[in-house]
């Protein structure tokens, strides 16, 4: 074992004691959730971050470190989140789901669905007031550098820091094991991402054995501070050997060390490097004698952009983006009111003017000095605009890592350019890489190099960069549906099905062009509903039975062709008679279809005949029986009623409401099976009238409107009898436009009034404009790829996102982009890309997960050349 990056005197709880006499208290913080598509949310995060810096400025310390450290989320923790939303899982309540969750777990373990988070380590130096001599003596172990520091004073300082951190950052003290973890992260950066030690939950007693960790119990590493120089030298020797004859090459090989020394003596600047090679000696093997090597490039920010607003997504947040390499960042902070004073600004301007007069050789030099002076003036103007500015100096350090040194060089150049395009000036310290690496570790005192990189700002101004941030969406428990791709951390987005309505409206809309993955996602949600033994009614009006095909993978489903003589939605069969429900639904469905006014004699006569006592005594338990009774028992309006009913009773497409007659025999269809967990209503043989004058509608079109009303009634009644989540699914219901009453019953009513019963709807459409007023209260929205500018604008606005040209372009060109080498199908691996508004004020870019069952993935595929049609199913 070896020592830490800097010699330690001890580790106790969350306190680091350095041999140089320094004392550091340490806490882990969580980032504030940011919706990057909502300016008001961004402003809120800025205010919260400003509260943190303002509180820290009151602490008696001159050295603060905030380290943004990447941590891998344990697969077990992700599965625990899933299980938390699935009560009864361990007892075998969801047999169909267990196999899928095992597949999901294996994908996480393999790294395919690995998920990460960015934690923030706050380290604050306690003022101890040691002289330089005392610090040196402490390192030489001649004296105890902490002799004059009492445990009581350390505890008091520790408590003051904890109290200063706003609750929204969920601060928790670190442990000695966390120091080992942060060191592991620093040495393994680019090779692997270690799991953070588990922190005891609130009120839970810590494991004392796990808390013990020696100050000299760290893994042994060898740090090559001139990694790129070594590689360059090696390349030179190889090239030289190729140019020599066999004898010369052999001599060069035997005298390699002297050749290297000669090469370095001729090029003395090569002794300083721009890259580190951290060799993890404890992982050595035959292939890697020095152990696995992490190559790291350290960068500092020498100057910020002139307009700091450009820094929001290209500053510290860059480490969470898909930048092609591993990365962390650190902020070394000191608070200094004089740094933003008028006197300091005036002195800076005077110094710059003097330097300008003394050093400028041409107009370009004059321009550079003028730009610097303008920056000072702009900062001073910003400070004056703040009511109570908190002056602070910040040094921003970045570590980029990868196993391949040559690749990392190229990435570092690209990243430096990325910073430059955002207005930042980067500093890749030649010969100072190790110093910068050390500065990104807690317990290490700020160095002169870091002091040189300090930028002057105010707490409010710097908070606008949102250095402590995260973007997470979805529910905190439940089944996995998508990956958060707003950054490269790979958060798994969960859907809490069983408690979906606890937070309010739980309905969902999915919008996407053909081939964007809309129906694939809807079927993913549908599958989970059935896996969790919940109830779903859905309409499938696709002529080839898209959802009928998928229903073959569901455990308890019933496909009901409403024109196919399979079952009955006859209100007199389906609803209870005693409380008047059957009569009410019957009248609501049939009066409009029969063109009977509610104040007509026919309506009154029907009302009397529909009473429970009347029907029960005469055994009128179906509409067909009622029609026959009216025909056989003439009253004043019998002839009129018989004539109106007779037409519909003869139509074959009306079998779901009136029992059909075959060769004079009534076929008594059974009522719709109320026990099925999923009912797929096949309505492909019914066309709906979309005009404004119902009198012009064809008979089948008029009946279709009544049938959809009957389906809505059946769903509402069935769901009202069930405790727990139930949902109505409707894909591409825009064909009902103009039939507001039908849409109200199918969409608006269950969406707005079903929350207390746990009911919600899931609706899909290719175009956002097809979501009418019935969908206005729905907050959870998925939007996938669109193919035209107007459609993209509508989709973004529907999801409560700004339809900027950048987002429209990203929607059209960078969302599941077509692959020209694959017949313009979505690029493999990028299917199902889009955005998700989770209804809680959070929006992020996402990628829909694949079905965890291969058969469901196959049956969900609607690509025209691969789609399985209902008529192809083996019956």
Where are these regions (language model features)?
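The Walker A/P-loop phosphate-binding site
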Residues: 2-20, 25, 279, 286-287, ...
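Conserved P-loop NTPase motor module
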Residues: 612-717, 782, 816-875
